[in-house]
Amino acid sequence: MISVFCPHCGIKYELDDEWNGKRVECSECNTRFTIDVKPKKPETVTVAEATPRSYHQGSSKWITCPHCWKRFDFKDINYISRHLDLLGDPILGDDAQRRFLPVKFSGHGMAIDERGMECPDMACPHCHLKIPESVVDLPCSIFSIVGAPSCGKSYLLTTMLWQVRKCLPKYFEFNLGDVDASFNSVINEYESLLFMNNNPDRIVALPKTELQGSGYTNQIMMNGFPVDLPKPFIFALTPKTAHPRYESGRKELERNIILYDNAGEHFQPGHESVNNLATNHLAFSDGIIFVYDPLRDNRMQDFCDKTDPQYRQEAVNQLALFHEMASRVRKFSGIQASDKYRQPLIVAIAKFDVLRESMGIDPAADGYLKYDEEKLEYALDLQCISNISFLLREKLLDIAPEFVGAAESFSETVYFIPVSAFGGSPKIIGSPDAPAGGSRKQALGVVPSQIKPFWVEVPFLLHLYLHGLLPAVASGPAGAQPIEHYKFTQDTIVFSFPGTKARHELPKAYWGMSLLCLEDKRYYVIPTPGGDGPAKSCQATSLDEQIDSDFWNKQ
């Protein structure tokens, strides 16, 4: 027998020797790895002369650092010294307070440094960067935001979080708050600039996300050379007392939400290096939001509002960037080329205000919500979201079919969501009379009082639903007709709408939904393999339940 530890979650397996050298998948975190050695259990350090807090006691607890993504036993966690004589850290540099493994604790349960000062702040034993206490206490859900340079990721992230912070307590009995203001200082500054500005009628602009810099990365010394790590945005998702599952499932609902926003250049081919691990978080993500900019695609520009000052910007090969992202996910996660990514991919079609009229897709601002008057509860309207995703997907198949194919070949669960961070066009700073589409690069901004975000919160809310944190319903419209001519092939249904000859292919995310046929403007129910018709409601369930988690028991 050999003892094997998953390199991601640390769970231990006892296997026969014949498994040595084979590639397997962890039943807990779905990480694929090759069994080629007999890993040693990580050494632990016993804390002596201590009166520890409750989580110092008991069995080991494994933690994933949100900075370097290495796992470690909580017994090995470092603390950040506070005495000024202890300035200088071998990993963070001369200006950082020294990190240390404590041997003494105060009566308050705080570590005591060499000079006798209480030290409440913890740090990763590998990268020495600060770890919030909530990362120790609560599980973490990681989401990555990817997009081309200048696609508006920073604006989208800021407005998305602003809307989500309002939407969750209002409709879903959740709060989303900062766990430590130092981690989210950039986002908080952006929110203040856009939504709490003392001069809301004056044009403002957010700075571009840089490849490096104190606001976006942390530089550490790793293996003798400097390495840049992205700064995570960390929030605590907690249910309110009015949440229907507060008493029965509070522990399952509470968690950290960790977001990463990289400069678009980080995802361009050739920008990956051992000195910059900015995109390694993709291997640990529970979902990806890919921001697709129609104004950086020459083919889609023909459908965009030509009066927008961003019209005819220099095109970017966003397909190549997507393939580079997918390649890194596979490489970092150990996913084979023939396998699909098992976490959801939400493609956010940004700046949709320039496409809304030409594409004829204009859902209500709150159309993604469904209210149950009897239960007095809100849920995501999965029927509406799926139908909008389908209509947008149909348009993209006419304009950029290769991108749709790439997205659905990469991930098992893909949605296409129209979003607009501003709800309208930005303004030209300092040159109001400059012609749109000019050759000179223009500085653009936005008037805070005119910001009307559209569906920016939906990608985030959809991720929460897909991971079992929000409820959803999928009741189709009355009079939806069945589809008679169809067949199932692997994870795809091939069909044609009644009275049409056009062939359609849809992945299983759309099965059971009532979708609008663009030719006759009628709704039709997409069949399911069991033939049960559309799902009447969808309780919030984890994606883990859709995955074969009994791998080890079957062998």
Regions from the language model: what does each represent?
Residues 232, 247-249, 257-284, 297:
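Switch II of P-loop NTPase G domains
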Residues 187-246, 254:
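Extended, Lys/Arg-enriched charged tracts that mediate electrostatic binding to polyanionic substrates
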Residues 45-57, 61-66, 457-482, 555:
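Terminal low-complexity/disordered tails
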Residues 2, 22, 59-61, 120, ...:
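Short metal-coordination and nucleic-acid-contact micro-motifs, chiefly zinc-binding Cys/His arrays
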Residues 59-62, 71-72, 79-91, 126, ...:
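Conserved G1/Walker A P-loop phosphate-binding module
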Residues 36-47, 484-488, 530-555:
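Short, intrinsically disordered terminal segments enriched in charged and Pro/Gly residues
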Residues 287-479:
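Conserved GTP-binding G-domain of TRAFAC-class P-loop NTPases and closely related GTPase folds
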